[in-house]
Amino acid sequence: MKIKANNANSPIWKDVYSHSKLPQQLEPLNEIATNLWWVWNHEGAKLFGKIDKQLWKSTEGNPVQLLQSLSHKRMEEILADKELAEIQKVYADFKAYINVKPDKTQPSVAYFSMEYGLTNVLKIYSGGLGVLAGDYLKEASDSNIDLCAVGFLYRYGYFTQTLSMDGQQIANYEPQNFNALPLTQVLQSNGEPMVLEVPYPGRTVYVHIWKVSVGRVPLYLMDTDIPQNSEWDRSITHQLYGGDWENRMKQEYLLGIGGIMMLNKLGIKKQIYHCNEGHAALINAQRLVDYIQNDGLSFNQALEVVRASALYTVHTPVPAGHDYFDEGLFGRYMGEFPGKLGISWQDFIDMGRENPGSNEKFSMSVFALNTCQEANGVSWLHGKVSQRMFAPVWKGYFPDELHVGYVTNGVHMPTWAATEVKKFYADKLGTKLFEDQSNRKCWEGIQNVSDEEIWNLRMTLKNKLIDYIRVQYKDSWLKNQGDPSKVVSILEKINPNALLIGFGRRFATYKRAHLLFTDLDRLAKIVNNEKFPIQFVFTGKAHPADGGGQGLIKHIVEISRRPEFLGKIIFLENYDMRLARRLISGVDVWLNTPTRPLEASGTSGEKAEMNGVLNFSVLDGWWYEGYVEGAGWALTDKRTYENQQYQDQLDAATIYHCLETEIIPTYYAKNSKGYSPDWIQYIKNSIAKIAPDYTMKRMLDDYEDRFYHKLATRSAHISANNYEIAKQLAAWKEEVAQHWDSFQVESFTCDQDLTVNGPVVGKEYNFNLVIDRHELQGMLGAEMVVMKEDPEKHTLSPINTAQFELMKEEGSKLFFKLTTTPSEAGNHKMGFRVYPVNKELPHRMDFAYVRWIQL
């Protein structure tokens, strides 16, 4: 027999993850580590830092990874040391917090979002939308709200940014090791992973479920990157905002359809269903199916029930920022739903179109508006922008009349206030501040704190940031093979005593990061003034598909390398939550320059406010409401030029002028103690008069007061007695819709001729209207609408609506009368409209049937 020289098969590997096992006495550390309570409770994070300072740093503040890497020797040292008592104390505080039961007097909420910014350790966020959602969960926990959240556990999350030496952004996608993250996998009773089966076109997608404990609030994350799925489907939860439009469709289908199926599987049912952006709109498609299949409701009845418990929050100020899907692509994924709902495909897809019956793409936002009873923007100004943006959905009404409201965004103060700041507030303002953050009286005491103490606090935070900038900038420079001698020269130019202005955000072109660099000669004079030194630090990521945003980054990096700007303009790579916390607490001024009104809210400036950092911003988003003279600086909200390039040049000149004549002189009006009393007064005013209005506590309270309670009450009302009111309302709407075209205006007169000279101010006019409803059974209302006309701007704005009084009803005829007296002279337009009336309607847009009639 011939003997082969080699006989071996391929290695057979099994993935295993080795980690340290904690002794029983240290088990509380695991419990604390897997609950994100430690993110905003300093004693928790401090505890892990003390256990192993180097490990804490190398794991980037990940307590789970730290404990898994802890040496046996270090464990024994902890057990033998007084650290054990400290662990027990922190654990006792943690348990006391966690064990508080939810406040059942507040409505329960299911919250859906594509991203959550909770900690840099969990890379399931990209920017402001996610960080806001993360802050919301933290405050819901602190406020003891019965809330659960739904999202995705991304394998790669959002990208890590590095910059080449010439400033070109490089996007790196690094896989997350789920076993080393502060989360737990949801298991079945037999200890095996719970698997959710979601029907996709021609196949089933299998989903694992993970739970992140955000204090008292559970966040359930779906994960398709498992062996049961094809590579194509495993990638559904690979990247946040990655891939093509089909991948986006697959993701939003999973978030909506799969999200509701997951809650059903977990046995979770809430009173309110909150869509954080249109990405989650399809939750209502699955909820409709559930009510039809489980409760025997018709489509229209189910729609009443679903709408009454649903809220849609829009974060996007322009139509182009919303998701639209081609009918073919949308139909591949949602084609079976009309059959489940008992309606036609045309009726179903029209729910996502501004103009039903057209060939428009399916809009997730329009579908959300049609299936959610309430909707809101994220600042007062954005609420107004949203009304104009969504006006085509309700063509019988004008933007200012729409039900679209607003809740101005806020930030979770315990997360974003630096540790030193929180300690300072506790010492100087009292711990009650943390329990009642939106109460201005709790903040007013800052006016009584000595100027010197505030200045010392600000300098402490600034020096920490400067130290970090030096280390991070040097590491990035050397990593990119930059000239070592040059980086030393740059670092030497960084002056801790100089006025430091920060700019950190997503690099979208409308954010106008380039604005400061419009006139480089003027900027060079400003930053090279030896008597009044000033420095700028920039940071931010551009979406990998956004060439314009990446070009802005490259442009700024190139400028920062010029001799006149070395050490004066600094760009830091890889903007994330950790870097954000350092910046918004360490700079002196936070700069924001968006094109108005494209900043829906913006929250980075609010985070700066919590730390006594002053804002210098365009009057847009939250700053439009928040700006207080003597507590920050603002660029005017007035637009001088239609040409954006000219407007940019004017705004840039305004920035330079404000720096030269207000900000820099105020900062450098220093006394013998080395600080400017005027500058400190700005800080005091900012903390006392602005900060309390922009906490997440105030924001959550607003959602409760403006939407959650209202929806919960209505939902309970129409669902009572086997959905009695919902069924009645659906039947009434069906009847009105069927016979709407049958009613006729029999007569419509005014007691005086309005066609010759028009109405006279102060004179009384009487209108009489008779309507014959014919087959229409429901009640009707009528009103006069007066619009003021601005001939220069070619705009109309409603100034008055006057309701006709129903005088009598005879058979199918309705007799109305209106007596009115004009009160304002000028160019006006006057019109009359008829609409259906039912006391069960929450607002007119809920059933927007309108007929305009002619006098």
Per-segment meaning from a language model:
Residues 1-855:
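Catalytic cores of carbohydrate-active enzymes across secretory and cytosolic contexts
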